[in-house]
Amino acid sequence: MARKSNLPVLLVPFLLCQALVRCSSPLPLVVNTWPFKNATEAAWRALASGGSALDAVESGCAMCEREQCDGSVGFGGSPDELGETTLDAMIMDGTTMDVGAVGDLRRIKNAIGVARKVLEHTTHTLLVGESATTFAQSMGFINEDLSTTASQALHSDWLARNCQPNYWRNVIPDPSKYCGPYKPPGILKQDIPIHKETEDDRGHDTIGMVVIHKTGHIAAGTSTNGIKFKIHGRVGDSPIPGAGAYADDTAGAAAATGNGDILMRFLPSYQAVEYMRRGEDPTIACQKVISRIQKHFPEFFGAVICANVTGSYGAACNKLSTFTQFSFMVYNSEKNQPTEEKVDCI
């Protein structure tokens, strides 16, 4: 009788543990913006082969750089107003809070790789422009042209359309009608219309990636070639910690995609992580970030992905007539393949 009555008691802790495992969100976890499946797979392979969260983020973003995801990541896309493709990237370690980033990187294809070298081999956070290229070469990266026939054609067509759209305002000649060079009107009294950006809504498809290792270590990163026909030297939100992405082992991680010139003003990734630190569900945290920006820029294009320390994840986006749903990729220990998920924009 004693043996029979003790058996259920002995099983209680085991059954409780099993129930808790099923109810908790599984780790490891990879989440990235947009349906960039191969990037998700590359990150997962890095984890499966014993790599760290940083290794996974670097591998995933590097895959998109090689594949030129959606023309908005890597070489051969988004030429600036001079016809040059430049790259921004960042990687962040949520354990040490170290960050490595590059902005306006020229003639180096593997931007996320250079960003990691900044993290590992300097005490700096961000290197930019030609100096970032010099650093990359010292780290063994190859200096090569990032332009392609496709990017050159995009630029030629833009010039033929009188440089429309562009990102200038309050200058002469009128940027809504003519190409530059531009200059401030100075003391000349001229009726210069306020220039309204007419960007392609899908022209900001940065890859942002969040990885949570099975040990709980968290990393996040980004890579992009920015926006088409940007002013030469422009750096977006992607390489800015707290804007493009943010990671903290004690709270979670987030990454943003969209109009970087607006997003960076609100540090959405940092804000989302802080919401999760307070106990907000990842989806709610993402929605709150979007709502904060909406109050000032109701027509902005943008989305955010979030994941907390348990592996729960979510996303949110700003609803526009041309953008009503946001797609992102998820891979965790319960899935046998990367899965595309969608959220309705708010």
From Swiss-Prot:
One of its GO terms (biological process) is protein deglycosylation. CDD domains: Glycosylasparaginase. Substrate binds at residues 234-237, 257-260. Glycans are attached at residues 38, 308. It is found in: Lysosome. It catalyses: N(4)-(beta-N-acetyl-D-glucosaminyl)-L-asparagine + H2O = N-acetyl-beta-D-glucosaminylamine + L-aspartate + H(+). Disulfide bonds join 64-69, 163-179, 286-306, 317-345. Keywords: Autocatalytic cleavage, Disease variant, Disulfide bond, Glycoprotein, Hydrolase, Lysosome, Protease, Signal. Changing residue 12 to L: In AGU; uncertain significance. Its EC number is 3.5.1.26. GO terms for cellular component: azurophil granule lumen; cytoplasm; endoplasmic reticulum; extracellular region; extracellular space; lysosome. Gene3D superfamilies: (Glycosyl)asparaginase. The active site is at residue 206. The modification Blocked amino end (Ser) is found at residue 24. GO terms for molecular function: N4-(beta-N-acetylglucosaminyl)-L-asparaginase activity; peptidase activity. Cleaved into an alpha and beta chain by autocatalysis; this activates the enzyme. The N-terminal residue of the beta subunit is responsible for the nucleophile hydrolase activity. Its main location: other. Heterotetramer of two alpha and two beta chains arranged as a dimer of alpha/beta heterodimers. Cleaves the GlcNAc-Asn bond which joins oligosaccharides to the peptide of asparagine-linked glycoproteins. Belongs to the Ntn-hydrolase family. It is linked to Aspartylglucosaminuria: An inborn lysosomal storage disease causing excess accumulation of glycoasparagine in the body tissues and its increased excretion in urine. Clinical features include mild to severe intellectual disability manifesting from the age of two, coarse facial features and mild connective tissue abnormalities. This is N(4)-(beta-N-acetylglucosaminyl)-L-asparaginase. It comes from Homo sapiens (Human).
